[in-house]
């Protein structure tokens, strides 16, 4: 049997872990939705190119903001409404007037669109909006919202299509508001909570003489000695005369949100046809410590603005080399223990989680390591049952951000009674040098294997403790050397 490449096995294993457990839905604007949810903009850019940043792990699973049923009588507690109390989505609970990208909206009929990755039977959808006098610099709580939904759509206890749109009459508001969309699933005791950051701008454009042409997204921290700058394009191409450069000359400026703010300030100080910042209630461009939209003056012939970097130092590498994981472990009267070795590339934290085939977590270890450091780790499984298991290895940088993830498969097998000794010639790898065509050995999995005839019999003796590809039953290419009896 031809062994699948490791990369394919990794993909299959990852899909088993995450594909079924983390597939639900989110508020989108793919077809006719008025605005994307906060979590959606963590993964997908808006039509303006704007995205939310520093969202944590939920940026990889925007469909998974799932929490307890029954809002507002029950459901997520105050301060945890945006995350629905999901640990994946903790960052979504941050709340200030300038933390999140906002989408323009108007009072009256608006379409709200949901995209589903698993279209559960649905009880209903409800839409709430913040009160006119809410405080955008306090965590979202029930007191922030008008707790009478402005729109309720009956789900009929049937499965919706993979994308649905609801036309709702949005109440009159001014400035920055938050809409809470709640999808009440009919076949579980959970609901999905998506907050939508919107800004009411009246019936016409707030600044008709300006159009958005780019944005400053604080995607990464920089180092002292680096430079961040604007690349401005007009009808003829890039025009260096409009460039604004910011030298990163202090530790404070290395922080992503700080240099984004400083670059926006410098643009506003040095440019007359380019402005940066979020538009406030007085129609002023105010630089923020986060994503800063860039606007171009009408009639300037300027087309767009991009952000460039001059990086003086290479980006750090983060990785871990894992060894010691066997492809198979036999179950006995003591719990199965994995004895592993880790070697770090970069200053990292390695998280190791063992799952069985049913995706139950059986063991967890978190190991902080310095660059080049080696550490031994033992993981004792809380349950030992025969079948497929997975070891998920996550590499986090010093800021706790996920840099790499891989999944390794292994099996637990029941202990087998060894066959009679006269059924085999050797217990592998005893007598290795004398193996020839027809030699029978007892392998580590308790089965008997016979060395293949010439010309394959030469593979039977090709084994060392560090080169095990032809080891009967467990090596990556054992079928080239042996027949299982």
UniProtKB/Swiss-Prot annotation:
Leader sequence residues: 1-29
Keyword Signal included in the entry's annotation: yes
Domain Chitin-binding type-3 intervals: 437-478
GO molecular function, a single term: chitin binding
Main location: secreted
Chitin-binding type-4 domain mapped to chain residues: 30-200
The keyword Ribosomal protein belongs to this UniProt entry's keyword annotation: no
Localization (cell): Secreted
Listed CDD domains: LPMO_AA10 (cd21177)
Pfam families xrefs: GbpA_2, GbpA_D3, LPMO_10
Keywords (A to Z) from UniProt: Chitin-binding, Secreted, Signal
Gene Ontology cellular-component terms listed: extracellular region
Protein family according to the UniProt entry: Belongs to the GbpA family.
The protein's role, per its UniProt record: Probably interacts with GlcNAc residues. May promote attachment to both epithelial cell surfaces and chitin.
PANTHER family linked: CHITIN-BINDING TYPE-4 DOMAIN-CONTAINING PROTEIN (PTHR34823:SF1), GLCNAC-BINDING PROTEIN A (PTHR34823)
Protein name: GlcNAc-binding protein A
Native organism: Vibrio vulnificus (strain YJ016)
Gene: gbpA
């Amino acid at each position: 049997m031809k062994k699948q490449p490791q990369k394919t096995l990794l993909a299959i294993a990852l899909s088993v872990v995450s594909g079924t457990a983390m597939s639900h839905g989110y508020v989108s604007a793919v077809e006719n939705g008025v605005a994307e949810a906060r979590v959606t903009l963590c993964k997908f850019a808006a039509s303006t190119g704007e995205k939310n940043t520093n969202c944590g792990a939920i940026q990889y699973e925007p469909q998974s903001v799932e929490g307890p049923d029954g809002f507002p009588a029950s459901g997520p507690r105050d301060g945890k409404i945006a995350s629905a109390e999901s640990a994946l989505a903790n960052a979504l609970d941050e709340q200030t007037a300038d933390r999140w990208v906002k989408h323009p909206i108007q009072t009256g009929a608006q379409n709200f669109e949901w995209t589903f990755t698993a279209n559960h039977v649905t009880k209903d959808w409800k839409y709430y909006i913040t009160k006119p006098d809410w405080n955008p610099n306090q965590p979202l709580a029930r007191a922030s919202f008008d707790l009478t939904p402005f729109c309720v759509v009956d789900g009929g206890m049937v499965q919706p299509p993979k994308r649905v749109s609801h036309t709702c009459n949005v109440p009159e508001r001014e400035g920055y508001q938050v809409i809470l969309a709640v999808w009440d699933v009919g076949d579980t005791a959970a609901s999905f909570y998506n907050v939508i950051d919107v800004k009411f701008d009246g019936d016409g454009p707030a600044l008709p003489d300006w159009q958005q042409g780019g944005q400053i997204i604080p995607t990464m921290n920089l180092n002292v000695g680096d430079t961040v700058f604007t690349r401005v394009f007009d009808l003829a191409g890039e025009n260096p005369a409009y460039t604004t450069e910011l030298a990163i000359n202090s530790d404070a400026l290395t922080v992503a949100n700080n240099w984004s703010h400083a670059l926006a300030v410098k643009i506003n100080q040095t440019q007359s046809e380019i402005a940066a910042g979020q538009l406030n209630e007085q129609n002023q461009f105010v630089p923020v410590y986060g994503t800063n939209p860039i606007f171009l003056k009408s009639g300037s012939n300027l087309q767009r603005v991009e952000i460039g970097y001059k990086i003086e130092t290479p980006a750090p590498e983060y990785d871990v080399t894992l060894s010691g994981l066997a492809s198979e472990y036999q179950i006995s009267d003591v719990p199965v223990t994995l004895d592993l070795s880790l070697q770090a590339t970069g200053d990292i934290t390695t998280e190791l989680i063992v799952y069985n085939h049913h995706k139950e977590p059986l063991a967890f270890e978190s190991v902080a390591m310095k660059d080049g450091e080696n550490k031994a780790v033992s993981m004792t499984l809380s349950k030992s049952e025969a079948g497929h298991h997975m070891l998920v290895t996550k590499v986090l940088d010093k800021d706790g951000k996920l840099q790499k993830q891989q999944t390794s498969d292994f099996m637990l097998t029941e202990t087998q009674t060894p066959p009679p000794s006269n059924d085999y010639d050797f217990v592998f790898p005893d007598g290795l040098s004398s193996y020839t065509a027809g030699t029978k050995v007892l392998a580590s999995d308790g089965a008997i294997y016979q060395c293949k005839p010439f010309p394959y019999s030469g593979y039977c003796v090709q084994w060392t403790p560090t080169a095990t590809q032809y080891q009967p039953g467990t090596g990556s290419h054992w079928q080239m050397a042996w027949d299982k009896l």
